[in-house]
């Protein structure tokens, strides 16, 4: 991760959304399975030691962010590698599709490294290359029923048929990926880390003919929020990004719409509102896990695509996110289509617009 100027700490979660494939069984109101119980209360701390006088180097050091926050994600060092091609899923006149895995590693400022094997699907166009690439971040599908490559099958094929390598990231805890037992308590920030590391794994690969300086991100629903957090945490990583039918860029809104439950419901011990406090009780935490307060860190052009009759992620969310991006100085465009969340009749037109955007930005 490049050194970068410090900005006040925050970090992120995406708690909702669904997939684009009309055949995918995606819930618009996800209720994730419990993963772990909240930690027990810590013992009383020792008396605080006397602070030494700050030095000039101390003043220049980047201040620590909340560990569970978007800026906490930024302060980690991310390394993606070991992209391995597996079985051929599909072989068409335009592209070959493979099952793949890659390694997603993140190291904290304290030097603690976590490493996960992430599964996915890779479509590679026919020809010699090198080809531009798009990393795909899918929407919410219950990990208990999710299957490898599910959620953006149409988009993956469309991109590859137009000459783009398309890497669909399953995320940790999905399909053949390793399980992170704390992914819920960490507000699913690991999903954004996996997307960042997917880009780096493509760039490190000798087996995939990728133009490693011509890569973009493409996320649907929950995945739209995933890629916005990746842009905040790793400015300059890619050349462009396209959030489709995205969840809100304020995590409190996502929680209220998709995850808030009866206060007496104890069936989900990893409910973030129960563990970290509800948005109205701990607003600082929820802002720290939102991308919007840190849009001024984003350096890439953004194309937002949204349906006017989306009843899963309300159109007002897209309007608010776009306005906040523009106010922060981001080159953002918002395209509207007369369609719903999953994009049926307007899919081809929306994909053609998105590919024109990628063609312009990755040229």
Regions flagged by a language model, labelled:
Residues 75-128:
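N-terminal cap/lid segment of alpha/beta-hydrolase-fold proteins
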Residues 128-131, 136-178, 250-251:
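Short substrate-entry loop that stabilizes the transition state in hydrolases
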Residues 228-279:
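Hydrolase active-site cap/lid region
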Residues 185-206:
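Alpha/beta-hydrolase active-site loop
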Residues 19-68:
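N-terminal low-complexity, Pro/Thr-rich disordered segments
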Residues 298, 304-306, 310:
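Short beta-strand/loop motif that positions the catalytic acidic residue
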Residues 316-363:
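C-terminal catalytic histidine-bearing segment of alpha/beta-hydrolase fold enzymes
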Residues 15-17:
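C-terminal motif of bacterial Sec signal peptides marking the signal peptidase cleavage site
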């Amino acid at each position: 991760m490049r050194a970068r100027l410090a900005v006040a700490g925050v970090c992120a979660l995406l708690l909702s959304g669904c997939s684009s494939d009309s055949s995918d069984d995606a819930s618009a109101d996800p209720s994730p399975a419990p993963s772990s119980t909240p930690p027990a209360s810590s013992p009383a701390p020792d008396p605080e030691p006397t602070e030494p006088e700050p030095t000039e180097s101390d003043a220049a050091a980047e201040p620590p962010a909340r560990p569970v926050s978007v800026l906490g994600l930024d302060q980690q060092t991310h390394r993606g590698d070991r992209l391995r091609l597996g079985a051929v899923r599909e072989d068409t006149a335009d592209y070959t599709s493979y099952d793949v895995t890659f390694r997603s590693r993140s190291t904290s400022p304290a030097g603690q490294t976590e490493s996960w094997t992430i599964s996915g699907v890779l479509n590679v166009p026919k020809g010699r290359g090198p080809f531009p690439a798009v990393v795909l971040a899918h929407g919410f599908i219950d990990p208990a029923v999710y299957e490898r490559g599910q959620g953006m099958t149409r988009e993956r094929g469309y991109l590859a048929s137009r000459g783009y390598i398309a890497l669909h990231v399953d995320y940790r805890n999905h399909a053949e990926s390793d399980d992170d037992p704390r992914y819920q308590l960490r507000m699913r920030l690991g999903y954004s880390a996996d997307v960042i590391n997917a880009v780096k794994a493509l760039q490190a690969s000798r087996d995939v003919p990728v133009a490693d300086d011509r890569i973009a991100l493409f996320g649907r629903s929950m995945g739209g929020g995933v890629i916005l957090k990746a842009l905040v945490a790793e400015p300059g990583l890619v050349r462009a990004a396209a959030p489709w039918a995205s969840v809100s860029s304020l995590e409190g809104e996502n929680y209220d719409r998709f995850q808030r439950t009866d206060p007496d419901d104890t069936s989900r011990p990893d409910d973030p509102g129960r563990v970290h406090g509800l948005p109205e009780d701990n607003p600082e935490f929820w802002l720290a896990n939102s991308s919007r307060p840190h849009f001024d860190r984003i350096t890439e052009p953004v194309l937002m695509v949204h349906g006017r009759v989306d009843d899963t992620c309300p159109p007002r969310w897209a309007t608010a996110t776009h306005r906040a991006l523009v106010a922060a100085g981001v080159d953002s465009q918002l395209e509207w289509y007369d369609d719903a969340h999953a994009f049926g009749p307007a899919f081809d037109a929306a994909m053609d617009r998105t590919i024109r955007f990628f063609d312009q930005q990755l040229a």
